Amino acid sequence: MATQSIKEYSLNFQGYWREANKGGVPSKSGIYLVYRCLYNSEQNTVGLKEIIYIGQSVDAHERIVNHDKLDEFNAKLQRGEELCYSFAEVDEEN
């Protein structure tokens, strides 16, 4: 039986994008997270509540801006929460 080696990756998620500014997600290949968050306007921070989706795309910007599961994501939000996104670049070849 042939064995297949497992490739290991280190992902660097830098920052976050709130639903209102998700257009800032780069048009690059990578892994993205969709999560429930609470935005603190006084401190300009978000508090991660729950990761609700993990995806991959050759163009994360296009995928997130036009995500076909947006209604499903919004249905998971609780009072005062909003959707937030994180992105880690991964070369297309990987």
What do the predicted segments below correspond to?
Residues M1-N66, S86, E93:
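GIY-YIG nuclease catalytic motif and its immediate N-terminal context
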Residues A60-A88:
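A broadly used, surface-exposed interaction patch
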